């Protein structure tokens, strides 16, 4: 079974832990202590293939920056999350993406831009078009709006990253060994 190392990044309070826990455990937790770093494992089936996802739920971008290079180096796919209710969380993502590309030393990094808390439409300050435009600027990066609370597009975030990783590094099908018979 193939393993995937996925990293959830973004400013504090955007709902990184809520999205991760909703995906892994199927529950929405209203109150959290700020995350330092949590790791979760979940086996899923994506496109008829069993996958083991290791998801790293990280601290907000403004905290524990020393650890960030390490999990960027080890991660295979990245969810960059902002809250549609806070413009500053959206603005923070450009630097975060640039740091990922610098650490990975490539532009071709499986990544998805996630506008979280789309259930709070009446508190929206970041328009959907802003997210779509930023994703286009980022070499047509994948983009979704989500809600951990309302279970909107939660699974899709992680499944999309798995598909991107598979496109970048396809699973090699094991060829059956040819059996040979030697007659003496």
From Swiss-Prot:
GTP binds at residues 10-18, 29-35, 60, 116-119. Keywords: Cell junction, Cell membrane, Cytoplasm, Endosome, GTP-binding, Hydrolase, Lipoprotein, Membrane, Methylation, Neurogenesis, Nucleotide-binding, Prenylation, Tumor suppressor. This is Ras-related protein Rap-1A. The lineage of its organism: Eukaryota, Metazoa, Chordata, Craniata, Vertebrata. The keyword ATP-binding does not apply. Activated by guanine nucleotide-exchange factors (GEF) EPAC and EPAC2 in a cAMP-dependent manner, and GFR. Counteracts the mitogenic function of Ras, at least partly because it can interact with Ras GAPs and RAF in a competitive manner. Together with ITGB1BP1, regulates KRIT1 localization to microtubules and membranes. Plays a role in nerve growth factor (NGF)-induced neurite outgrowth. Plays a role in the regulation of embryonic blood vessel formation. Involved in the establishment of basal endothelial barrier function. Facilitates the progressive accumulation of CDH1 at mature desmosome junctions via cAMP-dependent signaling and its interaction with PKP3. Its main location: membrane. It is a lipid-anchor. Residues 182-184 form a propeptide. One of its GO terms (cellular component) is sperm midpiece. Found in a complex, at least composed of ITGB1BP1, KRIT1 and RAP1A. Interacts (active GTP-bound form preferentially) with KRIT1 (via C-terminus FERM domain); the interaction does not induce the opening conformation of KRIT1. Found in a complex composed of CDH1, RAP1A and PKP3; PKP3 acts as a scaffold protein within the complex, the complex is required for CDH1 localization to mature desmosome cell junctions. In its GTP-bound form interacts with PLCE1 and RADIL. Interacts with SGSM1, SGSM2 and SGSM3. Interacts (via GTP-bound active form) with RAPGEF2 (via Ras-associating domain). Its EC number is 3.6.5.2. It is an enzyme of class 3 (hydrolase). GO terms for biological process: cellular response to cAMP; cellular response to nerve growth factor stimulus; cellular response to xenobiotic stimulus; establishment of endothelial barrier; liver regeneration; negative regulation of collagen biosynthetic process; negative regulation of synaptic vesicle exocytosis; nerve growth factor signaling pathway. Pfam families: Ras.
